[in-house]
């Protein structure tokens, strides 16, 4: 006889454990358990059947894998948490005795320090794994770097996040690893490629953030504590991989005066220092290390060899011309008009990296200096100036500098009379650079709006300046990660290039019909008001006549006569009526339906807008427009052809085709809706 299984020893009851059981098993508090799970990357699980997973009658809401909790039993942080718990008891005991000094001494000297280095190495065995998990870390750290300091967000945490983020930005600038950027409602998206891994993160706009109380900053602070350690490891590895010293030199005074990126100074590892480090190591064979003079002699010989090779490899002018022609990017064009668009080769990374290298930019004080400076420097610009109000670290604070080739402005063009006058005698502490009147144009300089920088970066080339001039209507700013699909709406193209045949004419006909129906509705409302007034007058006359019945045209007697005439026509009492009925059956059916709708509307007390009393609207509704009729016939023909083709398919392929057709239909309807909206806007603009 088989042994009876004990309940709760196998299946879901064994694989899952509740949060209360896990906390009791680890012997730590619930907040420490949350922190430990965040550090180790352990999150709750959802069993298929909560009743089977729970060993009690009351179903629990939070479950974890039993093997994950068993794995946490060997974590060194548990000892730190228990030491912190014991220290808290000692501090509480000292405060209970009134010994505040002893409590402060215990907190200062005996507080356990928590390090997360081993957890970072454990969770990310390779550097590529750390890069793949860097998206959320960058988004959260950039968020905290822009938050105001509160009791929940101390200034020390904000300063640490800002320093790590600026160090990461300096690496992107030094290696030209930034690829795309997009301005959205949530903030600014950036995408960089590091060692073949695409990293996408979000940076909020620098508005005044209102910190609310419904956000649990303790949980977010735990993530920040782990992500700062992770980003510190990543920055160290990135800097050392390109031969830079980490951490870079940081000038706190410049940072206090708003230098931001300019407060950091990057330094490369010197060859002499590396040789000294190598020479100071003990030799295994007992020989002494080489002296510095010998190392310098070797380095001098290597430098001479490199100079000779570079001198011999210098090409002539003709060779350069040939290489330029060879390296030119070919453009692949389709021969057939209906062929697919061939993917075109793009510029190399070096050309895109030096996109703004030959320009000198000046950022006006109303433009966002931080993201613009980062983008311009990441794509090769070495000379970026801005107004002195925006902080230190600029190439120039003089707006009249003749070396400036592009000025980024984000202000509307105002008349000269609306501008305030400049102070003639600037007070003490004013800027030494001469002030320029707002709206003044300097000769030999391009004035552009900030979107020009983002669009040039996403397109990988310099765009036209006149489209982004101050006060001009900007082109649509599209996401660089969304590719235009065939048949979809593309705001960069004109309506004539993407609309179907006769789409504009059909929409014009629909608009005309809507206008006619609105006019007919207004006329019907007026007639209803007039009839109500006439009925009120007749009721007054009836009351004056003593309640006598008065024959009114269009009363029930006429309706009865019309019903009798219809009955006679059905019986065939009159040959002439039968001939009329055979010739105009459709007209009678339409009139009968219209009459029925009129009666229903009258009984409900609503105006009937389908007819104006003379029958002209019914004729208009019956008569279709030629373009709409032609389009409907074409659609019907295409649908019939498609149904014939579907008959030859299997059931599986037919279902797949139906899904594809349904999704394509939804996309076409959405694109047509957007084109219609744009057409109305353009027509309204032309009408003005």
Swiss-Prot record:
Q: What does this protein do?
A: Component of the NOP7 complex, which is required for maturation of the 25S and 5.8S ribosomal RNAs and formation of the 60S ribosome.
What InterPro entries does the record tag this protein with? BRCT_dom, BRCT_dom_sf, PES
Where's it mainly located? nucleus
Region Disordered: what ranges?
Answer: 411-442, 496-688
What name does this protein carry? Pescadillo homolog
What's a single GO BP term from this record? maturation of 5.8S rRNA from tricistronic rRNA transcript (SSU-rRNA, 5.8S rRNA, LSU-rRNA)
Tell where it localizes.
Nucleus, Nucleolus; Nucleus, Nucleoplasm
């Amino acid at each position: 006889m088989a042994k009876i299984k004990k309940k709760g020893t196998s299946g879901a009851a064994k694989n899952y454990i509740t949060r209360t059981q896990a906390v009791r098993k680890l012997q730590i508090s619930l907040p420490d358990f949350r922190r430990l799970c965040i550090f180790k990357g352990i999150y709750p699980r959802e069993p298929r059947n909560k009743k089977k997973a729970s060993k009690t009658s009351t179903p629990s809401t939070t479950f974890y894998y039993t093997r994950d909790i068993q794995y946490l039993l060997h974590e060194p942080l548990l000892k730190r948490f228990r030491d912190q718990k014991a220290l808290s008891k000692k501090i509480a005991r000292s405060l209970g005795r009134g010994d505040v000094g002893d409590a402060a001494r215990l907190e200062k000297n005996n507080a356990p320090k928590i390090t997360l280095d081993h957890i970072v190495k454990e969770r990310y065995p390779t550097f590529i794994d750390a890069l793949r998990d860097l998206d959320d870390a960058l988004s959260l750290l950039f968020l905290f770097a822009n938050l105001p300091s509160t009791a929940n967000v101390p200034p020390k945490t904000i300063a640490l996040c800002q320093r790590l983020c600026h160090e990461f930005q300096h690496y992107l600038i030094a290696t030209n690893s930034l690829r795309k950027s997009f301005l959205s409602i949530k903030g600014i998206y950036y995408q960089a490629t590091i060692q073949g891994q695409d990293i996408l993160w979000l940076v909020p706009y620098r508005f005044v953030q209102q910190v609310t109380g419904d956000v649990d900053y303790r949980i977010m602070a735990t993530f920040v504590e782990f992500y700062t350690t992770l980003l510190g490891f990543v920055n160290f590895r990135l800097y050392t991989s390109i031969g830079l010293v980490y951490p870079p030199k940081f000038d706190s005074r410049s940072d206090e005066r708003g230098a931001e990126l300019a407060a950091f100074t990057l330094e490369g590892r010197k060859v002499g220092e590396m040789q000294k480090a190598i020479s100071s190591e003990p030799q295994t064979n007992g020989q002494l290390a080489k002296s510095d003079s010998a190392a310098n002699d070797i380095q001098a010989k290597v430098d001479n060899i490199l100079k000779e090779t570079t001198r011999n490899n210098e090409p002539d002018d003709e060779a350069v011309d040939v290489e330029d022609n060879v390296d030119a990017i070919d453009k692949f064009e389709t021969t057939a008009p209906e062929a697919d668009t061939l993917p075109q080769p793009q510029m190399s990374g070096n050309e895109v990296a030096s996109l703004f290298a030959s320009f000198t930019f000046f950022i006006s004080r109303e433009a966002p200096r931080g993201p613009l400076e980062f983008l311009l420097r990441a794509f090769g610009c070495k000379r970026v100036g801005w107004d002195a109000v925006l902080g230190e670290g600029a190439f120039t604070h003089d707006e009249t500098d003749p070396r400036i080739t592009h000025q980024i402005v984000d202000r509307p063009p105002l008349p000269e009379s609306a501008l305030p006058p400049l102070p003639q005698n600037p007070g003490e502490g004013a800027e030494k650079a001469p002030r320029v009147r707002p709206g003044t144009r300097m000769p030999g300089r391009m004035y552009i709006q900030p979107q020009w920088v983002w669009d040039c970066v996403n397109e990988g080339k310099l765009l036209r300046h006149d489209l982004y001039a101050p006060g001009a209507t900007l082109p649509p700013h599209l996401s660089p990660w969304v590719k235009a699909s065939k048949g979809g709406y593309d705001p960069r193209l004109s309506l004539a290039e993407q609309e179907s045949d006769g789409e504009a004419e059909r929409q014009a006909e629909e608009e005309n019909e809507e206008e006619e129906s609105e006019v007919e509705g207004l006329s019907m409302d007026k007639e209803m008001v007039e009839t109500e007034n006439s009925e009120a007058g007749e009721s007054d006359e009836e009351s004056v006549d003593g309640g006598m019945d008065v024959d009114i045209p269009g009363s029930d007697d006429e309706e009865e006569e019309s019903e009798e005439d219809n009955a006679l026509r059905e019986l065939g009492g009159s040959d002439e009526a039968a001939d009329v009925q055979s010739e105009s059956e459709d007209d009678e059916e339409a009139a009968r339906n219209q009459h029925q709708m009129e009666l229903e509307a009258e009984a409900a007390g609503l105006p009937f807008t389908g007819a104006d009393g003379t029958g002209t609207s019914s004729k208009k509704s019956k008569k279709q427009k030629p373009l709409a009729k032609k389009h409907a016939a074409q659609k019907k023909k295409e649908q019939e052809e498609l149904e014939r083709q579907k008959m030859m398919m299997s059931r599986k392929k037919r279902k797949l085709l139906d899904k594809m057709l349904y999704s394509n239909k939804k996309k076409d309807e959405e694109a047509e809706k957007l084109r219609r909206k744009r057409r109305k806007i353009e027509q309204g603009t032309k009408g003005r």
